[in-house]
Design a protein with these regions (language model features):
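Short helix/strand-capping connector loops at secondary-structure junctions
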Residues: 23-30, 59-63
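Short N-terminal "domain-start" leader segments
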Residues: 1-21, 30, 56, 71-86
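Short, well-ordered helical secondary-structure segments
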Residues: 2-3, 37, 41, 54, ...
Length: 87
């Protein structure tokens, strides 16, 4: 069983047995969550999703996580463009 340890706006972070789960509570859990290994990374993803920040230093995995978390179509398209440039 996981326990919520942090929330900012619509994003919640849960502690689970294998790390942390970030969930956008405005989306269904299946489509709006991602798993990360540490709390710091989870908070960074939440802050980036809220501020709709793009960073060229993001890993492919982080970009995919932000795509899953965000509701903003414009931001999602910018992230997809960045992901295509990395591939």
């Amino acid at each position: 069983m996981s326990r919520k340890i942090f929330q900012r706006q619509e994003y919640s972070i849960y502690r689970c047995s294998d790390g942390f789960v970030v969930h956008n509570t405005n989306k269904k859990f299946e489509n709006g969550h991602t798993h990360v290994n540490n709390f710091y990374k989870a908070k960074i993803l939440v802050i980036m999703a809220i501020k709709r920040e793009i960073d060229d230093k993001l890993s492919k995995r982080d970009i995919e996580s932000l795509i899953r978390l965000t509701n903003d179509n414009r931001y999602r398209n910018q992230l997809r463009d960045l992901l295509e440039r990395l591939e």
